[in-house]
Amino acid sequence: MMSYLIVFFGAGIGGMARHMVNLTAMRWGLTEFPFGTLFINMLGSFLIGAVVETFALKAGLPQHWRLFLTTGILGGFTTFSAFSLETVLLYERGKVFLAASYAVASVTLSVGALLLALHLVRTLIRG
């Protein structure tokens, strides 16, 4: 039960941070291209790499902190960071083809699922 609360509070912090970055990008007039989201994805990927490597190299760090930072805060900030980590882990394990396949499939299927949802909802609502 405690792990659920750790993730819950972390995700709230991450979600608020994502919202703040997007609002800042809009205030700066960056509306033609999703710069806020691009920044969030890059920063989240960098941070999850730093956190995971720190926990891997430093024994004795409490795992509830890893859960709070990665699944919680960074999961709420961006799910792209988890995708980036999983792709790199496959690559580092020598599964280059699997890593590339996962990256291509994740992007293609995710965008495809969104397009399908748009089509279905528009069809249902418009009749």
Swiss-Prot record:
The keyword Cell membrane applies. One of its GO terms (biological process) is cellular detoxification of fluoride. InterPro entries: FluC. One of its GO terms (molecular function) is metal ion binding. Its main location: membrane. The keyword Ion transport applies. The chain crosses the membrane at residues 1-21, 32-52, 71-91, 96-116. It comes from the Bacteria. Na(+) is not transported, but it plays an essential structural role and its presence is essential for fluoride channel function. Keywords: Cell inner membrane, Cell membrane, Ion channel, Ion transport, Membrane, Metal-binding, Sodium, Transmembrane, Transmembrane helix, Transport. HAMAP family: FluC (MF_00454). Fluoride-specific ion channel. Important for reducing fluoride concentration in the cell, thus reducing its toxicity. Belongs to the fluoride channel Fluc/FEX (TC 1.A.43) family. This is Fluoride-specific ion channel FluC. It comes from Granulibacter bethesdensis (strain ATCC BAA-1260 / CGDNIH1). The lineage of its organism: Bacteria, Pseudomonadati, Pseudomonadota, Alphaproteobacteria, Acetobacterales.
